[in-house]
Structure formats: C-alpha cells, structure tokens
Design a protein with these regions (language model features):
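Flexible mid-to-C-terminal extensions adjoining Fe-S/redox cofactors in radical SAM and related proteins
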Residues: 279, 294-366
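Alpha-helical membrane-targeting segments
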Residues: 1-31, 249-274, 346-366
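Radical SAM enzyme [4Fe-4S]-AdoMet core and its adjacent flexible, acidic
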Residues: 1, 132, 136-288, 292-294, ...
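Secreted/processed peptides and extracellular or luminal domains of membrane proteins
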Residues: 48, 52-55, 288, 306-307, ...
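Conserved alpha-helical substructure of the radical SAM core
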Residues: 2-134, 217, 229
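Short, intrinsically disordered, charge-biased short linear motifs at domain edges
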Residues: 27-37, 265-271, 285, 321-331
C-alpha cells in the first residue's frame, strides 16, 4: 500500500490531521516521527539498560528498502537507534536509503561513541548520505571520566566518546547540515552529581546539550530495576539545568531549536513524574512509531507492544499501522492508561499541543 496524499501534506496541515485522527479516528495517517531500532547488540553493559541481552535476526537493507517504500516521503523525523548501531557494517547504505526514500527533514543518531574503528569508517559516509536533511549526532555521556565508564559498563568509553566528538567536529567543517549534541541519561546513578556533570559537559561546547530521564522500559529490559530518579530528585536537577541552559544558549540554529524543545520537555517531564499521568495528550500510535530490529511495529518503546510484524505483512507499514491491534493500542493510550516522559515521543506530543508549542516558541526567541 502506498501512502495517501494527506500523508505528504505540509507539516502544519498534517499536525491538524493528527489531532483529528487522535480525537475522531480519522483521517488515518502514517507516523511522522519514526524510530528505527536497527540492532539490540551492544558492547556496553549500562546500569540503565539491558537491551544487549536480547537476540533477534536484524532487518536487512533489502527489508528496510521494502518497508520504506510503503511510507515513501512520509516521516519528517527519523531516529536510528540501538543497541549500538555501529556493530552493523551497512550504516552508510541504510542512511542513504532513509534519505533517498523517506526524505525526512531531520535524522537523529544517538550514539555511545564506543566502537572507534567502526565509527571512523562509517560516520563520514553517514554524514555524506544525509545531505539534504538535518543530521543530529548525539553522543551519550552520563558522567565524567571513569565514573562515566562505570555507569556504561565499558572501560575507556569516556575517552573514546570524546574522540567521536572530535571526529564529528572535523566532519562538521565541510558539512553544515551536521549538528553535534551531548546527551545525558539522568538516573539514580548520577542525579545527585548532575549539577557538576552538566557544567563539565557543557564546557565541551556542543551545539546542544540534552538530557532525558532513565525509564523502566520493556524495550530496554529495565522494568523493576528502579533506575528512575524520584520526582524531587529530578526537579532539583532540572532547576539547575534550566538555569544553565538559559544562561548559555546555543548559537547554532538547530541546536537552539532543540534546546527550546528540551526546556519545555524538562517541565513536562517533571510534571509527569510528580503526577504519574499524561500531562498533555500522547500521540504514540498516531504520529510516532518505532520499528524493532526484527520488524515488530510499536506505538512506543516504553510499552514495546507489537501491533504487527512487517515480515509477516509484506513489509507494508499501513497494513500494520491500521490493524485492529494498532487500534487497540491507540484506544489504551487515549484512555490515559499509561504515562511516561519518553523524550522522543514527547517532541511530537509537544508539536501537537498548543500549550507546549507556544512555550517552545517563547524559549527559542528569549
């Protein structure tokens, strides 16, 4: 099935259509925010993630090509996540398919910076393949020096991550579409030291500095691990973070835009942790989706509930996305049977919330 004309409408019109889809069930649209989890394999042994324990047959390039053809030109924002994506040797080709077929405005690559040889070999090709889109490379740093290595369960990760940042900066000199960010997961393992951590990481002068809260996710195998900081702990960390962000705003246009969304996200996340319920409507299952390494389609990675497998449905995203299983997932989310501060989905939710979007615009301008 090919995407409908409405799926390719300009984003402002599609946002209105998603609101109608959420409230009335029509018009039915494919997701604008797509996350591709391309492997569970990972050399890290993070205190906040057990995804490496999962073993599945990863999608091939040909399977991605078939899937992308079923949603050609639809996603606005594509995130390529893992595991550690760089265990794959075909990333430049995958990103070329994303650019050629999906043609998103933004491509996001979160990475731990650990596999130096593979990164040096593949990152230049990824940057080249994404010309025409904005590429955001977010290097994950949760602590400083050996403390970071301890949280990530990988000796030497700190120094290797800094090397990845240096490589990205060299590539940025001739590739203005590349934005370099640093990303921190705030957990019970680092929340008390977070004010010091964020000061030192900001001193590295990334285009943007972002954080998200550690969550108990089905995808990550962390349900029951008690890694999420308390609402009080997070509020204290966010207070310092927001103050630092406002006093030292990014001069990079894309970096400033990301920071503006993040400033709103920090407030939203704090409210969700305090109230334990959705603060603004969630559009996971309507406007945002994730595809697992073996082709399962999820509305979100926190619940990681498969609404169908692409391998079993002819690699047709619409067939899975508009299935009875997907409708049941959407009904559950609309009934507010879940609530979480998942950062990726929250971006989309904020775009679809007049309250949040107004605050984001204010953050960008002031």
């Amino acid at each position: 099935m090919t995407p409908s004309a409405l799926d390719r409408f300009p984003l402002p019109l599609r946002l209105l259509a998603y609101r109608s889809f959420h409230r009335f069930g029509a018009p039915r649209l494919l997701p604008a925010n797509l996350t591709l989890s391309v492997t569970y394999t990972c050399p890290s042994r993070c205190a906040t993630c057990d995804i490496w324990q999962k073993k599945v047959p990863d999608f091939t390039l040909d399977e991605y090509r078939k899937t992308f053809e079923s949603m050609r030109g639809v996603p606005v924002w594509v995130t390529v996540s893992g595991g550690d994506q760089f265990v794959r040797s075909d990333l430049p080709e995958l990103f070329a398919l994303i650019r050629e077929i999906l043609r998103p405005k933004i491509v996001n690559l979160p990475m731990n910076g650990l596999l130096t040889k593979q990164i040096e070999k593949q990152l230049p090709g990824i940057v080249e393949a994404t010309r025409g889109s904005k590429l955001i490379v977010n290097v994950s740093l949760d602590e400083i020096g050996e403390r970071h290595d301890a949280i990530r369960g990988a000796r030497g990760n700190w120094e290797k991550a800094l090397g990845t940042i240096r490589l990205a900066r060299e590539l940025q000199k001739t590739n203005p579409h590349l934005t370099i960010g640093i990303h921190t997961v705030i957990s019970r393992h680092n929340v008390e030291r977070f004010p010091e951590i964020q000061r030192e990481l900001r001193a590295l002068r990334p285009d943007s500095y972002i954080t998200e809260v550690a969550e108990e996710r089905v995808e990550l195998g962390t349900v029951g691990k008690r890694i999420t900081p308390t609402a009080e702990q997070y509020a204290g960390a966010v207070k310092d973070l927001v103050s630092a962000a406002r006093n030292r705003r990014s001069r990079h246009p894309m970096g400033r835009l990301v920071e503006s969304f993040r400033l709103e996200y920090y407030d939203l996340c704090r409210e969700i942790l305090e109230r334990g319920e959705q603060v603004i409507p969630c559009y996971a299952g309507w406007a945002s989706a994730q595809i697992s390494p073996d082709g399962h389609v999820w509305g979100c990675c926190v619940r990681a509930e498969s609404v169908g497998n692409l391998r079993e449905n002819g690699y047709d995203m619409a067939k899975v996305w508009f299935s009875p299983e997907a409708d049941r997932f959407r009904k559950s989310v609309a009934a507010r049977e879940c609530a979480c501060p998942l950062a990726n989905a929250s971006y989309t939710n904020m775009l679809l919330s007049p309250r949040s979007l107004t605050r984001v615009a204010r953050n960008y301008l002031w």
